[in-house]
Amino acid sequence: RQIKNRIDSKFYEIIHTDIIIKSTDSPLEGAKRGKETSMWLAIQSVKEKKAGIVISAGNTGALLVVAKLNLKMIENIDKPALSALWPNKKGMSVVLDLGANIECSSKNLIDFSIMGASLYTSLYPDEKPNVALLNIGSEELKGNETIKETYQILNEKNSLNYNFAGCLLYTSDAADEHRRV
């Protein structure tokens, strides 16, 4: 089946290139493959406002490096985060980071909560999102020091943009209980 049979061609453009970033490339090797790779061209299309989003099934590390080289970061945000929409019985959950960052500080996790809540609100403007930390358990005392510190900060912080719902051990029942970021 061809894409054009499923999606109206006015919504996409295919730009061919023979230069690829391999899944076995390190993030830096991928970025060094240059400005003619499909990933670089896709990110460049967002920078030039020819596209609003990039969807990639390619090398995740290279995607983050190429994006960081080409796109401006939001002021005071140190790390980018991948996001995904996960369906649940009550709707959708927005999940950030998705394992893209091996190590995060509590500041990074708080930044992710703000970015995730903002994304959720842009998709569902009539709902106030619930933010939860994915953790090894739902109890406040579980997790490493970074998770515990982040929990305390988010729990004490009054946000007009979202409700803090604590820690979440991700199960299908937990996801269905609330629409969460």
Indicate residue ranges for each PLM-predicted region:
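Glycine-rich phosphate/diphosphate-binding loop of Rossmann-like nucleotide-binding domains
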Residues: 106-166
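Phosphate/nucleotide-donor binding subsite
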Residues: 10-51
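Short, acidic/small-residue loops that bind anionic groups at enzyme active sites
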Residues: 66-98, 157-166
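Conserved small/polar residues in nucleotide/adenosyl-binding loops
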Residues: 170-178
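Acidic/polar active-site rim loop that often engages polyanionic ligands
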Residues: 89-102, 128-136
